[in-house]
């Protein structure tokens, strides 16, 4: 409300999987919402290509870049989906087009649509619940190690930041990699003030045994069980 009172729009970046548990951004007053669609059934693929998601309130639809899928009916009265509100520039003047989406992104958008249709609301809720529960378990286990602490004491979904009190994150993560475990992402490579921190992500695919193995491995590098 504070943003809208001064004429500003509210933009939100969200994790699509989290909506299996949380309210939609639009229900919280968000005007434009963006997301990385990689979590919707796409494997790692050596870092890409992936797909982006962007949605907004109806009054802004015609200003969206990209291709917009709309619902209509065919001549037999059956529901179908089409690319709608397409400008002429998308087909005849590429330099002025708002969308130059290539086949790669189209294929991954289709993959995401298939994944969502197969999962359904119940499936997405189950995946989101598993992500949240397993991440919470991993964070609680990390908090038992004297060497580490949670850097941000805020609610989280499936990612959390761990601080290494010995400030030796590169060596710590290399130690884990040498044992074929990707323990986390060092944040110091982007933010100098987070040089002693790394990000851990836990999804529905990780087992309790794998989480316990990670915690044990990190503890064996000098953390020690408390």
Kindly give the residue locations of the regions a language model identified.
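Conserved C-terminal alpha-helix-loop-beta "cap" of PLP-dependent enzymes
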Residues: 122-214
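Active-site C-terminal subdomain of aminotransferase-like
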Residues: 40-146, 150-153
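Solvent-exposed, charged interface segments at domain starts and junctions
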Residues: 3, 12, 104-106, 122, ...
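Generic structural signal for hydrophobic core residues of well-folded globular domains
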Residues: 116-119, 164, 218-221
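Conserved PLP-enzyme active-site core in the AAT-like
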Residues: 1-82, 146-147, 162, 170-176, ...
